[in-house]
Amino acid sequence: MGSRARLVGISAETGMQIVILRIPLIYVPGVGANFLQLLQTVNKGWPLPLRGIANRRSLLYSGNLADAILVVLKHPDAANKLYLLSDGQDVSTSQLVELIAKALKIPARLFGVPQGLILAVAGVLGKSRAVDRLFGSLYLDSAKFRQDLGWVPPFSLQEGLNKTASWYQNSLRNG
């Protein structure tokens, strides 16, 4: 039994209302893991072979997630529903690098390499999964959440990236 089915069962047994939010990668000042690695790489100005990637990625800024949770807690129509949630602006990996560079106030250094070549080299180096995440698509349509609950994210993708980049640059200055 999946986690959603368990929650629905608990709701049926107890009468407790539930709301399930499915979310993509969250970015936030203080971010770590792969997103931090991408910030570091873009900030160093290294040329990246990511130009022309035609994937589609959804992201969610932590401020938008917090606001959406407040909306869910206050809105009676949210009860016992499942919603997909994102910033609402899907981007390719290439576009994400460009937006991060803009937030860092540096030029994006992208060049094109055939995707097959990158995948082959990644396979030899044992990095296929990491490259698959860079090239793959993962997007969520949050239109139902917006329509049902009248939600408008308080932060655009660029605003969230600006706040995250500002944190990153301050952390470099402050050690």
Language model segments and positions:
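Glycine-rich Rossmann NAD(P)(H)-binding loop
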Residues: 28, 50-55, 83-90, 99-105, ...
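A short C-terminal helix-loop "cap" of Rossmann-like NAD(P)-dependent dehydrogenase/epimerase domains
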Residues: 39-50, 106, 142-143
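Substrate-positioning beta->alpha
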Residues: 2, 31-37, 51-74, 80-84
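Active-site Tyr-X1-5-Lys
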Residues: 1-19
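Conserved C-terminal active-site "lid" loop/helix of NAD(P)H-dependent oxidoreductases
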Residues: 62, 95-98, 121-152, 163
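Short aromatic/basic micro-patch
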Residues: 20, 59, 90, 139, ...
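Flexible, glycine-rich beta-alpha linker
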Residues: 16-37
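Mid/C-terminal beta-alpha module of Rossmann-like enzyme folds, strongest
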Residues: 71-129, 158, 162-165, 172-175
